[in-house]
A protein has these predicted regions:
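Beta-lactam-recognizing serine transpeptidase/beta-lactamase-like catalytic domain environment
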Residues: 1-226, 296
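Ligand-recognition elements built from short beta-strands and adjacent flexible loops
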Residues: 180, 194, 224-306
Length: 306
């Protein structure tokens, strides 16, 4: 998670030039900050390092190439994506930051759940049990774990990065923040795969936001997807979809009995972790997750030793 790439605002792959939103240059950043700032160019370079085969292996493992198996009729099987041998330079670059594919909202939910629940891809169900008129349990649906996609330690880091996105106060997920709750989230703004254009000539968009609560041990997942939102100001999901997710959480969490801890994390005091003897790259990740600005200063003794 401490992999670092440089974003100059534009990045060329074959004959295609990619940009971050507003052509913004994010500079040299790690994964936590790339997630928070939705840096397309970071993830293009990460995809190039991973390679087409490994990228597709994880795409498949997270369930994007198959039905979820939900207990509802007529689940679509018409997913669109590039297979490993179809992932050329441009296809891999586009896929690496979440475009060039068509997946269902339920597929996205099961994948996000796997990312934060310890790494397990689970079959979704409409209900968890069936009772009779007297309240006696007739059938327990149970949990069907299909496979483990990532390790529990990797899942823990993802939860921390998603909480950093919402609670840091500067990330795309800040508009999903609800006082007193530990919320993790990620925004997603993408062009629709059918490439249909609006009247103004721009491509139609999908604005989405995934939120989990509590961030350290998620019990609920909220996924908001807006199909080509008609908003004159913006189509960014951080502005349009994230507040909707926050509103849903503010209503659903009390109903489900998820208590607040009374802490306002938008202005919270952060305890600096003990990073003595920690490698600089690992220390950067931990500091970034907590939203702490930092700078490396070599001591006189270390300079002499070098």
């Amino acid at each position: 998670m401490n992999t670092i790439f440089t974003c100059a605002g534009a990045y060329g792959v074959a004959k295609q030039t990619y940009h971050c939103a507003g052509h913004k240059a994010h500079g040299t950043i790690n994964m936590a900050d790339a997630l928070r700032q939705s840096c397309n160019i970071y993830y293009i370079q990460l995809g190039q390092r991973v390679g087409s085969q490994q990228f597709h292996n994880y795409f498949d493992a997270f369930g994007f190439t198959e039905r979820t198996g939900v207990d509802l009729p007529s689940e679509t099987g018409l997913m669109k994506y590039y297979s490993a041998n179809q992932l050329g330079e441009v296809q891999l670059a586009s896929s690496a930051f979440g475009q060039a594919m068509a997946i269902t909202p339920l597929q996205m939910c099961t994948a996000v759940a796997a990312a934060v629940n310890g790494g397990y891809l689970v079959t979704p169900h409409v209900v968890d049990k069936i009772t009779d008129t007297n309240g006696n349990v007739v059938e327990e649906i149970g949990t069907n774990i299909r496979r483990q996609v990532i390790s529990e330690s990797t899942s823990d880091v993802i939860r921390q990065m998603m909480e950093y996105e919402v609670g840091n106060g500067t990330g795309g997920g800040k508009n999903a923040y609800v006082s007193g709750y530990r919320i993790g989230g990620k925004s997603g703004t993408s062009e629709q795969l059918n490439m249909h254009r609006r009247a103004d000539g721009d491509y139609k968009k999908v604005a989405s936001f995934a939120a989990v609560l509590p961030a350290d041990d998620p019990e609920i997942l909220v996924y908001v997807m807006l199909d080509d939102p008609n908003n004159a100001r913006t189509d960014y999901s951080s502005i349009l979809a994230a507040p909707v997710a926050g509103n849903i959480i503010s209503e659903v969490a009390p109903y489900l009995g998820i208590a607040t801890d009374g802490e306002d994390r938008s202005q919270t005091t952060v305890t600096v972790p003990n990073l003595i003897s920690t490698e600089w790259s690992n220390a950067q990740v931990q500091l970034n997750i907590q939203g702490l600005k930092h700078q490396l200063q070599e001591s006189q003794s270390s300079q002499s030793a070098a």
